[in-house]
């Protein structure tokens, strides 16, 4: 039996790019689609907030010599491209109850995001793919992922990372002795200065107490395991580690 009834998956554009920094990777896309299908088949309702960093990043506006707001608009349209690509792959794999909803109207290819309609679609078994963030510039898709989770009554946010299996006490790519946290509280993340997601998104999650699961999307079955209540990656919630201290991961994963 699933632990969660409804989740929001935060999917970065980099996950779609696979081993490349930009563009698309067909193997990565198929892996993502099959992971989503597995979660749906477990009975969990799924909404997906898709990023666009594999196509364009608004924070690179200076590099291109364009206005930041214009750059963010381009980035939002990049999330539409990724959402349509994901929908196309899911359809090719046999999924037929799919909706792409956008915060910026693109009526020729998707429907506008309307909260109550999105909730209704989830209740009817649709996988809802959410594009364009929340339609506002100066934000990554971290904030809309938490925002949509709260709006849609999701039980948790699953932040899928590509090649990173949780939150560490230091950068594991630089420090081979870096240790991964199994559990953290919101306050522990702040006091330790750990980088989990954009601060505005993290504060929103903390204020409303929605659990965050930071995990490696490349690990097959990780999303489904999390939804069943098995531990993967790092869990951030109101309690954190036992006895008020952050819990470091052990060699064996445990049920949470």
From Swiss-Prot:
GO terms for molecular function: ATP binding; UMP kinase activity. UMP binds at residues 52, 72, 134-141. Inhibited by UTP. The keyword Glycosyltransferase does not apply. Belongs to the UMP kinase family. One of its GO terms (cellular component) is cytoplasm. This is Uridylate kinase. It is an enzyme of class 2 (transferase). Keywords: ATP-binding, Cytoplasm, Kinase, Nucleotide-binding, Pyrimidine biosynthesis, Transferase. It catalyses: UMP + ATP = UDP + ADP. Pathway: Pyrimidine metabolism; CTP biosynthesis via de novo pathway; UDP from UMP (UMPK route): step 1/1. The gene is pyrH. InterPro entries: AceGlu_kinase-like_sf (IPR036393), Asp/Glu/Uridylate_kinase (IPR001048), Uridylate_kinase (IPR011817), Uridylate_kinase_bac (IPR015963). Homohexamer. It is found in: Cytoplasm.
